Amino acid sequence: MKVLITGGAGFIGSHTADRLLKEGYEVRVLDSLQKPIHNSIPEYLDDRIEFIAGSATDIRAITEALQGVDYVYHLAAFQDYLPYFSRFVDVNVASTARIYEIIVRDKLPIKKIIVASSQAALGEGLYLDSRGNEVLPDTRLEENLKKGIFDLTAEDGGELFLAKTPERISNPQNPYGMSKIAEEMFALQLGKRYKIPTVAM
């Protein structure tokens, strides 16, 4: 059995590769080796890994990487705090759509796709204000962060308290989180529609 790991040179990807090798899988890694994170193939990557240098946004690289694999761990992602809004969509959403597009187009017999989401896709979570009212806070204010105020506050500036919550709808507050929830939706819905077993974690 062969596994493709996109973003496999990163921290989570490389540890996933190590575990899969230990379990007896063949591992192929697709990674763009983006600077400043990587300057070359990291020394910590096991020599048994088949490495393809390329981006998850490149249809040719993805097409090559998908050939002959049974499982896909799609871990490649873009995360930054700079306003590269379209890049979040290109890397985190469009690359996921491309993977499904190629699998459907080429009728590849993929047994399962595992997509890495993020806690950022959930948003800040549910809070209670001082009167016990539920509050879904917006983004932390930059002026508060500059003052060293990192806790979320109510609209009136009052204190908020983290609430125990039942399952709730996601409420991401930054471009990274928005792109990761969109990625989850693409993966789960395309997987369901085209009968490609898919998990978003």
For the regions a protein language model found, what residue spans apply to each?
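N-terminal Rossmann-like NAD(P)+-binding domain of SDR-like oxidoreductases, especially those catalyzing
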Residues: 1-200
